[in-house]
From Swiss-Prot:
Residues 8-109 are annotated as: Contains several HHXH repeats. This is Hisactophilin-2. Homodimer or heterodimer of hatA and hatB, linked by a disulfide bond. It is found in: Cytoplasm; Cell membrane. Residues 34-86 are annotated as: 2 X 13 AA approximate repeats. Disulfide bonds: none annotated. GO terms for cellular component: actin cytoskeleton; cortical cytoskeleton; cytosol; phagocytic vesicle; plasma membrane. It comes from the Eukaryota. May act as an intracellular pH sensor that links chemotactic signals to responses in the microfilament system of the cells by nucleating actin polymerization or stabilizing the filaments. Keywords: Actin-binding, Cell membrane, Cytoplasm, Disulfide bond, Lipoprotein, Membrane, Myristate, Phosphoprotein, Repeat. Residues 99-118 are annotated as: Disordered. Its main location: cytoplasm. One of its GO terms (biological process) is hyperosmotic response.
Amino acid sequence: MGNRAFKAHNGHYLSAEHDHVKTHHGHHDHHTHFHIENHGSKVALRTHCGKYVSIGDHKQVYLSHHLHGDHSLFHLEHHHGKVSIKGHHHHYISVDGHGHVSTSHHHDHHATFEEHIL
């Protein structure tokens, strides 16, 4: 499916740095590029350094060195020109008002991103 960048409601892009997913870049660069891999009806988000965005059993967002089954697979839900990233246990990747990346069981503007095709 190619590379994507995801811009949060706060104007910052999801960014993969070291073992963390953050949002402190107001512009996109290689840290904010995610390769979308098809896995049947779901997708995986692979970072520039080959790690996978994942959601753990305690609903934390982390980067994994390997594809961790359902923990690393997502549905991209498109609506009204935006996208939501729905993952493990039906939780959405979310960005709070301070830019902290976590998950939310609720689908609201914190869990909605502008999708930029690169």
